[in-house]
Amino acid sequence: MHRSQPLLALAKSLNDYSNNIFKPLADQAGGALAVQQLARAVLPESMRPEVTLGDGAGTDPRNRLSPRAAVRLLEVLDHELTAQGRNLTDILPVAGIDPGTLQKRINGPHEVGRVVGKTGTFGDYGASALVGAVPTSDHGTVYFAILNHNVPVPEARRRQDRFVAVLLGQLHSSPWKYERDSRPAVQRAELVSLSP
């Protein structure tokens, strides 16, 4: 038996950097079709056609995800985590705090720690996405999805960050209750003997 960091810590680390290292394992467990079926199962019937996955790395031209389906999937994930005494900060990066794709984004003085989210990028002039959540005192958690296509990635990110800055100002957001765990999430696994 191997002992490693908890699964949530590993998932968080992988999501911080948008790492696809588990794609080969996922392929053996049913691949994109299995993930597509799971995603569609938690969506209302009318949204199910809005999720089509051709692969697990975002490179297949058949991949399709609508912004409203992305928001609904994030909302479902949030509710599942809440039911287990967790929240989105346990599995997704917090902008301006966690290392990775959101560390240097959405990090102004009134923005740091107020957005948890997931990025996605394909090519330099292909696709760029930001799906996230913002805690507010008046509206609860507000979810958003920004999916850009055929826009240079730096420009898409600039537009996404600007949209989020306006959203934060309009919603009078509050920071997530979050303290970054500085221990390495991915470290050498320990071999544990099962015999007494």
Predicted segments with their positions:
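A small/polar active-site loop signature that marks catalytic segments
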Residues: M1-R86
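C-terminal soluble interaction/assembly domains
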Residues: T52-P196
